[in-house]
Amino acid sequence: MTPKEFKRLYRIITILLEQGIDELVPARYQPWPGRLARRSLFWLKKKQPDLSRGARIRLAFEALGPIFIKFGQMLSTRRDLLPPDIAEELAMLQDRVPPFCGQAARLKIEESLGCPVETLFDDFDETPLASASIAQVHTGRLKENGREIVIKVIRPDIEPVIEADLRLMQTLARLVARFVPQSARLRPIEVVEEYRKTILDELNLMREAANAIQLRRNFTGSDALYVPEVFTEHCREHVLVMERIYGIPVSDIPALEANGTNMKLLAERGVEVFFTQVFRDSFFHADMHPGNIFVSYEHPDNPLWIGIDCGIVGTLNREDKRYLAENFLAFFNRDYRRVAELHVESGWVPPDTKVDEFEFAIRTVLEPIFEKPLSEISFGHVLLNLFNTARRFNMAVQPQLVLLQKTLLYVEGLGRQLYPQLDLWQTAKPYLENWMHEQVGPKAVWNAIKEKAPFWAEKLPELPELVYETLRQTRHQQRHFDQMFADFRRHSRRQGQARYLLGVGASLLLVGVFLLTQKQHIEWGQISLAGAGLCWLLGWFKARSH
């Protein structure tokens, strides 16, 4: 560890102790090295002892800086790991970072694009439109067509800072995992590694550009979601150029109402967008918090969502989608047996899981929830309770489902802020049932045939030759197998004879030794020993023969 890293580690420990984070672990569970280290830092006193544990954790993350703030934001979505009071506090973390100077942004853009800013853009504004811990956004116009754009640029020299903090976070996670056995349920090493992958992905803006292009293509012509156009010819690893949009932040409800927005339809559109992404496209925006969603000023009676910042996306394979849709339908029909069976069939829980016990555990957790009217039930919290129950039965971590549950909580929370009477189940059920019908009905079979038709048309001329070759190889393999079986039987017979001869030889040896001790039977003893030697010699030859 370098002196600079050691200084940073001391700073982290100081902040954690001043916020009393060490007291969150009961003394009886604290390992002796931890207690000793705490006593050795006796001059560090807790600053705000009256605050709740969630507030103290939030303040610690805020004091540790932007990388830890983003980590806290990520943790706030892992409600399968954290108590609700801590998760709610961490959700209040704001990525407030002073902008870096516009001249530095200009130099970074020119370094990435390999030419002066004025060559490509007009009206480049060095005053940032927005600033965050990883990047900041400037505005301008494309020189070739005059279109308004935003230019997102990664902060200069941010990578070494992130790498250093990540190394320290990994060190702390390993120490916690080693010395605090009760932390196993929180899986600190795994959580930090997940965060590491997420934040390193955010440093590559070409990935975000590709995600935005995919999402825009999926919703071309849609009246539910609009994704700004990306100008790929001007995008690089540290620079993203895309269309500038104008809209009302989705969380600004007074502005939406003043614009005459149909709030009920807007809330339902959010649900439609989410389930369309998941079940039609298998590709969903996984960071749909209010800061990334706007509503178009145009057509307030037919509101259009606008999505930005596609740095984090999720994907589902066909099997995940099928099991997920069946799970939704099963637990809203209170068919807990089917929910348990689906978890086993999907491989989300081990195959030796006792379905009866799993069903009982699910029923115990979900049945009280479903005593409420469906319109009052939180879809996201049902999923959360289901995953927490499954985790007790050794459910493997499913990153795609964690992202899905986080996004669903965002969408549901937004929907009910916009229209408190939103019945998420009634809005979502048609999408689920329609998707299931398309996957398992006659239409699905016909679509599968059509999808595979070109492949079989290409392979059809080769079919007779393939059949002949298969039959020839089968006949050859049968002859080879028969020969191997005959050789095996011969070998087994020889081995049996060898064991028999060795056994007889051992018996004759014992008899011979006994007779040699009797003076009147020495000749018979010699004959027995000779017989034993002969039997062993024959047995040895039999055993060596193949």
Swiss-Prot record:
The keyword Nucleotide-binding applies. The chain crosses the membrane at residues 496-516, 521-541. Belongs to the ABC1 family. UbiB subfamily. Residues 123-501 form the Protein kinase domain. GO terms for cellular component: plasma membrane. It is a multi-pass membrane protein. GO terms for biological process: regulation of ubiquinone biosynthetic process; ubiquinone biosynthetic process. One of its GO terms (molecular function) is ATP binding. It comes from Aeromonas salmonicida (strain A449). It is an enzyme of class 2 (transferase). InterPro entries: ABC1_dom, Kinase-like_dom_sf, UbiB, UbiB_bact, UbiB_kinase. This is Probable protein kinase UbiB. It comes from the Bacteria. It is found in: Cell inner membrane. The active site is at D287 (proton acceptor). ATP binds at L129, A130, S131, A132, S133, I134, A135, Q136, V137, K152. Its EC number is 2.7.-.-. Keywords: ATP-binding, Cell inner membrane, Cell membrane, Kinase, Membrane, Nucleotide-binding, Transferase, Transmembrane, Transmembrane helix, Ubiquinone biosynthesis. Pathway: Cofactor biosynthesis; ubiquinone biosynthesis [regulation]. It holds the Pfam family ABC1. Is probably a protein kinase regulator of UbiI activity which is involved in aerobic coenzyme Q (ubiquinone) biosynthesis.
